[in-house]
Structure formats: structure tokens, C-alpha cells
Amino acid sequence: MTTDSYPKKYDIVIVGAGPVGILLSLCMSRWGYKVKHIDNRPVPTATGRADGIQPRSTEILRNLGLKRKIMAYDPAKVYDVSFWDPRPDGSGIMRTGNWPSCPRFIDTRYPFTTLVHQGKIETVFLDEIKKAGTTVERPWTIIGFKNDGLDATYPVQVQLKCLDTNVVETVRAKYLFSGEGARSFVREQLGIQIRHKDPISYVWGVMDGVVRTDFPDIQTKCTIHSDAGSIMVIPREDDMVRLYVQIASSSDPDFNPRKTATAEEVQNVAKKILKPYYIEWDRVEWYSVYPIGQGISEKYTLDERVFMGGDACHTHSPKAGQGMNTAFHDALNMAWKLHAVESGLAQRSILSTYETERKNIAETLLDFDNKYAALFSKRRPNAGEVGEAATAETGRSAEEDPFVKTFKDSCEFTSGYGVAYLPNIFNWDPSHPAKSPLFDVPGINLVTGKAFTPSTVTRLADSNFVHLEQEIPANGAFRIFIFAGRQSRSKKAIADFAANLEKERSFLSAYRRSDIGEISFFERHNPHSKLFTLCLIYAEKKNDIDMDSIPQILRDYRYHIYSDDIPDVRVPNATYAAHEKLGFDPEKGGVVVTRPDSHIACTVQLAEGSGTVDALNAYFGSFSTKPLGQEQASRL
């Protein structure tokens, strides 16, 4: 049975409602796009699957307005990781080390891993997706697609089938996105191969349940090696614990990738591994056995109309807890770039950066996955190294101990804050051949391609202490943070900056809102353009800032004018902590552009004259659909 011959048209069809699909669906739905979202499961995830939210992902969830709802489930929070190994006398296991899962050298407000099962996370997303006007249709699957170009605006034809009724629906879309998981129909139809980086594969038994035990670290993340085997312990919400038990490895003489084990067999293995401690199960909520091989898709897209993300592109072991987190980052990267193109800001060619950025991160993830396994199974750190690594500051010594360096790099990467996109059209580092000498602020502590550093400031509109990196929600807009330094020193530079923003072909004027005449007085983030939000931060005490001397175009962002007057323990001697932590001279200031995903795009010196806005025009003009930088006056 098929539907009528006039196919409905969508901006995007999303297949799969796992982590990558739901975050992409939420962003696209909230940002005004028509989304067709299907999943082949009759109901959302009830138990099991991914459960670890890393610190940077928590930051993203807060930026999406979801963190509070997820925390309402009272999830377990892992601040510490313990390592257990065999006792020398063979009498069982002993703790050989423990350290923070997110050490102090990582600047985050969330120095912990949040653990709650995927079904609850999905529920939060699905509720918000529905509020934004999209419903995930179940149980539907994809049975065919082609980019036939018969409709220039909606070039992708997609065939979908309801698994309950066998109804087949044909739709047209601008884009098709596969978030189907490791067994992706879309990837298979495109003929894209998974390249296995590591020939070693594993079979794991995974069990969620409520246990009784005298093992002292049951509420802590643990990696346990014993003469009877290896286990990973992950605390969960509602008094549950997740146990990962390695059942088989391809290094075993009789390795069978289809090897299985019953829940009772895995429990018996766990009991042997944990000796001299006992463990008993009150109940088992979920149990599964699955093979793990490290693989990465050779391509994420062939035509920049049909894309893939999440497990459809990369698979790895559960040790580092990265699957869902990497999927979230894939989705956000995809979402803001599609929005940049479809909103008319960016040329279509920028979509190629989705694959180059995210595939590079997946490659790095698999490399770290290998290091993680080697680090904890082949070499035991001594107590001195553990303490040194956990307290070390970044960049301390060029001759760091290999273990300390690997530990730091691993923690930073797995936290999400080690993700660094390489230089490209969006990420301008000092190697970029930009003509303006104002790019790159001397002494800046921000790294292009990495997430914006947290800082706390006072919002002048209501005197609230706020987290600057969270002040602009994930709305698809670029963020321009103007660190204005001392007001008396920067007054002319700010006046010139504002005057040049007013020009007709400034980035702000060229993409001003079509409804700017009707815009609400209460519009917080986008009074001029839906594609940019400006923030102004002065190195002054709150009551010393003269609002009347701030140009009107910047005063329009009245909810985004701040005083840098809150101390920061990371720069205890700083008078103006946000400026100084980020590396700005409090007298001179500077400008930071972050992408809609909060990664650093570029930094620019704040100078008198047109130079600062000229530099920003050059940056945005490198990918914009309109010429930027002409000299006519604007009506903003």
C-alpha cells in the first residue's frame, strides 16, 4: 500500500531516534525547519544502552535548556575513577589508585560524568521535540532513497515504510540524515565501507541491576583487573549499577565473535573477579551481549545531501563512555551548518566541513580508545604518578612522564573539552593568511577550534551573576563577545566598532532581520539579526559603567552587557578575571567570535577605526552568500 502521488516536502528527513537523531531533530525543529523524523522501534528505549554524559555534553545540554530536566532524574555523578588489580599474594583484588575523572586542569563547571540511562535522556529530548512541532513517527523504517535532482529545492526522494501497516510513503527532502546506528541502511545503500582501525575486537556482557555487596567502590566508576578477568563498574540512578564484563577477545586462541553468555554466567564471572568481596543481585533490569570492534566510516556523505552521524559512522569500546557524547557533537555540528546554509548566511560548500571536522574527531576517539585500553591493562601507574597527573596544570613541562601526558590528554579528550577542530574556513588560527593584522590577540589563552572557556560575570540588566558561556542559548547564531576593557580607554574603539556595524555591508547589517521593524522590545538575543548575537563585557565594577555612553546599536543588546567583576579561583590574582583568564589586556580588551556550537572561531584585537569590524567582515565574508565590507550607511 502506498500513499498518494504528490509527495510531501521536508527540509530534512531524519532516520533514527537515538542520541544523534534526537539532538539534530530538536535543533532543526526549534530553528524553524520542517522535519520528518522516524524510528524503527515501536517505543523509545526502555532500559540499557548508553548512559554516560561527559562534562562538555552537559554544557551543551544546558545550552539547549535540557540539563535541569535530566538532572531531575537524580542521576549518579562520577567524580572519581578507581583502579583495582590482583593482590600479590593471589588473595583477590586491591585498590591500586584512584583519581578525578575530570582533573582540575580541565576548566569546567561540571567536573563529573552524569549517569542516567538513555531512555530517560531520550524522553527529555522527545518532549522538547514535540513542543517544537515535530513528532517521531514509529515504527517506521527507510526502504529507499535517491538524490535524483528532479526537484532542485528538494532533490532527495525518500521511501519510508510503516512496520505495523506496511504503508509506504514517498517524500521529498532537502536533506536525509541517517542516525540509524551501526547497521545503517543508508550507509549500506551508499556503498560506504566501515574501516576497522583495530583488528582486535571484543565481546562484552553488559548488565544493569540492583546489587548487594561489600565492595567499597560500588558507587564509583571502577576498572577492575583480576586473575579471573576484567570488569568495569558504572554507578547508575535508582541504586542501580552497570557492569561491563569482557567475555571474549580476538586475542583469545578460541575467539568467537558470536560468543554469548547468560546473565547468570556473567554474574558468576563477576563474583570471581570481585573476590574477596561478595556481590549478589536483587534484580537485573537489563542485560545484553554484544561484540565491539573499532571502526570508522570511510565517508560521512557522498553528495552533501545525504549525511550520516553517530554509530552509523564510528564504533568503539564502552571504556571511555564516548558513544552518546560523540553523537551529540555530530548532531550539533550538522545542525548549525545546515542552518547556516538554509538561512542564507553560508555558501553550500561549507557543508563539507561536517565530514572533515567530525571524522577527524572520530579518528582521534578511536586512537584514544586504544590508548585507554593499553593504559589500564598493560601498565600500572604508581601512587606518585597518579597524584601528579590529577593535580598537574596543562602545559607544565615539555618533558612530562608518558603516563602523566597520556592521562591528561585522555581526560581532556574524554571530557569533551579536548575536542579541537583543525583550521578551516570556520576556524582561523595564527596560520590563516588573513589580510588584517588585527586577527589573533597577543597573549590570548583561547585556542581556535576548542570550546569557549567558562567565565562568570555580572549582567547589568538585573545584577545577576551569570555564566558567560551560557548566556546565549543554542539558537544557531554566531556569538560575538566584545571584551571592552576599561570603558575610559576603549570608548572611542567601541564607538568606532558600533559605527562600522551600522554600515550597510557589515556582517550584522547585511543579514538583518526582515521583521526588524516589528521586533519585540523584549527580544533578548537577536534584536538585529537571527544569525548573530553580541555581548559586551567591561573591565569595570558594575556601578562604574556608564550605560549612556554605550552606542545605541550595542545598547539594543541590553541583556548582554556585563561587568567583569566576579573573582575566579583559576586566576586568583586577577582584578578582572574574565578578561585575564581568557588572555585579554583589561586596558585594551579584544573580540572573540564563537561558532553556534560554542567553539572558538577567531579572535580579533579591539582597535580604534574600522579595523575590528573590517576583520569580522573578512571572517564572515569568507563563507557568506553576500559581499561584506562596503561603505554605505545602514538603517539599523
Swiss-Prot record:
FAD-dependent monooxygenase; part of the benzoic acid degradation pathway also known as the protocatechuic acid pathway. Benzoic acid debradation begins with the conversion of benzoic acid into 4-hydroxybenzoic acid through hydroxylation by the benzoate-4-monooxygenase bphA, and its partner NADPH-cytochrome P450 reductase cprA which act as a mediator in electron donation from NADPH. 4-Hydroxybenzoic acid is then converted into 3,4-dihydroxybenzoic acid (also called protocatechuic acid) by the p-hydroxybenzoate-m-hydroxylase phhA. It comes from Emericella nidulans (strain FGSC A4 / ATCC 38163 / CBS 112.46 / NRRL 194 / M139). GO terms for molecular function: FAD binding; oxidoreductase activity; oxidoreductase activity, acting on paired donors, with incorporation or reduction of molecular oxygen, NAD(P)H as one donor, and incorporation of one atom of oxygen. This is p-hydroxybenzoate-m-hydroxylase. Belongs to the PheA/TfdB FAD monooxygenase family. Keywords: FAD, Flavoprotein, Glycoprotein, Membrane, Monooxygenase, Oxidoreductase, Transmembrane, Transmembrane helix. CDD domains: PHOX_C. Coiled coil: none annotated.
